[in-house]
From Swiss-Prot:
It holds the Pfam family MFA1_2. It comes from the Eukaryota. Its main location: membrane. One of its GO terms (cellular component) is plasma membrane. Residues 1-21, 34-36 form a propeptide. The lineage of its organism: Eukaryota, Fungi, Dikarya, Ascomycota, Saccharomycotina. The keyword Membrane applies. Present with 28900 molecules/cell in log phase SD medium. It is found in: Cell membrane. It is a lipid-anchor. This is Mating hormone A-factor 1. One of its GO terms (molecular function) is mating pheromone activity. One of its GO terms (biological process) is pheromone-dependent signal transduction involved in conjugation with cellular fusion. Keywords: Cell membrane, Lipoprotein, Membrane, Methylation, Pheromone, Prenylation.
Length: 36
């Protein structure tokens, strides 16, 4: 399950940079959510 990624995907679908930030911060937030 990836609630954070799933919600961020449609919102930042046009912002690839934001997605990278989510991945980097995801490691600090929830590695399982980002990796999943």
């Amino acid at each position: 399950m990836q609630p954070s990624t799933a919600t961020a995907a449609p919102k930042e679908k046009t912002s690839s940079e934001k997605k990278d930030n989510y991945i980097i911060k995801g490691v600090f937030w929830d590695p399982a959510c980002v990796i999943a």
